[in-house]
């Protein structure tokens, strides 16, 4: 039993374990509602990490929106931080892994989740926040919609600034931008020795490009490079060419080549020069579903097993809206 701000919760199990703490699956005694509680022992982690946890609470409170995971309340007791949040059905990473590796993710799903991610990241950027660790595991599926989570290493950019210098941990290597690895004033050939690096909103755009690439091709742009040192060199090398094959290289059954406009979006997001990358707002202005897409008859349908995972978490009107959107191949309103 855990008590947070006078409310009792029954612990049902563990949802996850991170470097700074654990996330528990709980049930509120009074209402029976299922929740997730993030528990962090602030006395057992580094000062910078503890500060990041407290800043995450502040950001969750400030960034409240349908596209951001909801924080209901929090409390600090005897150096233990408890954050009560809504519980999702699964995260995007697990959902993607649940699909057969021999099947390509349907284009309708790619476009749906891509626009959901853009909407969430655009919201935090509009509020001056750089996430710094965008990856499929940090997008939670809640009642059929994606919500952004984990602001532990996010940063706030002041209105009169365009970037921030960070001394905290980097994001996940397969999704990290070149500028987040390069040392300030360095030559870009190796990671920073002092762990200090400079990022801006375009760093999140690179990460989004890596996620889109993985949705389309089944792996991130640098995932085929096994050694971390070689991967770092490739990411930071401005002359490294990222492959955007029009045909499948993994021989998955039923593969459909990505439409040219989607390859162009990936190319723009994965520009080594961050100034050449579009903003998230600009990415949202692209008509992802419409004249640029293949005919509806050529688009693969969403497997029933995946639809069933989405259906049970939607209200009837939301489920009907999703079906209509997939049928007409146009974004949800």
Predicted segment positions?
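Glycine-rich ATP phosphate-binding loop
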Residues: 22-42
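A conserved loop-to-beta-strand element in the N-lobe of protein kinase catalytic cores
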Residues: 78-86, 93-94
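Activation-segment/catalytic-loop signature of the eukaryotic protein kinase fold
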Residues: 74
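Conserved N-lobe beta3->alphaC-helix segment of eukaryotic protein kinase catalytic domains
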Residues: 40-63
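Activation segment signature within eukaryotic-like protein kinase domains
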Residues: 113-114
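Regulatory extensions flanking the kinase catalytic core
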Residues: 276-320
């Amino acid at each position: 039993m855990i008590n947070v701000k006078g409310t009792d919760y029954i612990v049902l199990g563990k949802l996850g374990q991170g470097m700074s703490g654990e996330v528990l699956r709980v049930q509120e005694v009074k209402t029976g509602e299922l929740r997730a509680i993030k528990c962090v022992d602030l006395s057992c982690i580094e000062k910078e990490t503890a500060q990041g946890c407290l800043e995450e609470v502040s950001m969750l409170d400030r960034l409240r929106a349908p596209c951001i995971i909801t924080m209901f309340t929090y409390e600090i007791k005897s150096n233990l931080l408890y954050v009560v949040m809504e519980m999702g059905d699964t995260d995007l990473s697990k959902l993607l892994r649940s699909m057969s590796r021999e099947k390509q993710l349907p284009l309708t799903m790619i476009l749906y989740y891509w626009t959901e991610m853009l909407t969430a990241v655009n919201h935090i950027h509009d509020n001056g926040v750089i996430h710094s660790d965008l990856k499929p595991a940090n997008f939670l599926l809640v009642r059929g919609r994606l919500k952004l989570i984990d602001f532990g290493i996010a940063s706030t950019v002041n209105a009169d600034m365009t970037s921030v210098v960070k001394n905290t941990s980097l994001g996940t290597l397969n999704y990290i931008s070149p500028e987040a690895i390069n040392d300030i004033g360095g030559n870009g050939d190796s990671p920073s020795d002092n762990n200090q690096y400079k990022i801006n909103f375009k760093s999140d755009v690179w990460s989004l490009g890596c996620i889109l690439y993985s949705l389309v091709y089944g792996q991130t742009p640098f995932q085929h490079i096994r050694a971390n040192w070689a991967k770092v060199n490739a990411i930071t090398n401005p002359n490294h060419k990222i492959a955007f094959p029009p045909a499948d290289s993994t021989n998955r059954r039923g593969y459909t080549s990505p439409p040219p406009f989607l390859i162009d979006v990936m190319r723009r997001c994965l520009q080594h020069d961050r100034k050449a990358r579009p903003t998230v707002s600009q990415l949202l202005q692209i008509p992802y579903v419409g004249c640029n897409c293949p005919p509806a008859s050529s688009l693969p349908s969403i497997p029933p097993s995946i639809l069933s995972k989405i259906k049970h978490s939607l209200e009837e009107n939301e489920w009907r809206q999703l079906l209509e959107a997939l049928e007409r191949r146009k974004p949800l309103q």
